[in-house]
């Protein structure tokens, strides 16, 4: 029997939470709340993003609770994950990710489920491979066993990435 996997991402523009069911291979929750940017502004300062994420955690928690009630409760959660940095590089840091990391750590500790911290960029790569595997019917796990090139567009960044299988037991791939 599979389980549920709960994930959080608090990027500079969106508060996100998702619950994935290993049994069905589908998401039972895909919660996203765009952070407000004042008209005429180009984006958010980190302090504004952190404050907006903190205000959004109540709605995200309610969406999680409702989804878990339908799924049979929180006992099925096998792991919790969060984006803890923009990229998997030394020194990669943005305060907005601390909100999701704190929420994930709290939920993980309360449920006794392991916590996995990944980068926001890693999340984009993984979900792109997952989505493509659903559309084009290929084995996503096998896909990560060979190097490939990925385009990453997020916020104000555009990068071409070389993604390779990880030699670490804690990671699926390295960028």
Regions found by a protein language model. Give the residues of each.
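Short acidic/glycine-rich loops and adjacent helix/strand connectors
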Residues: 1-175
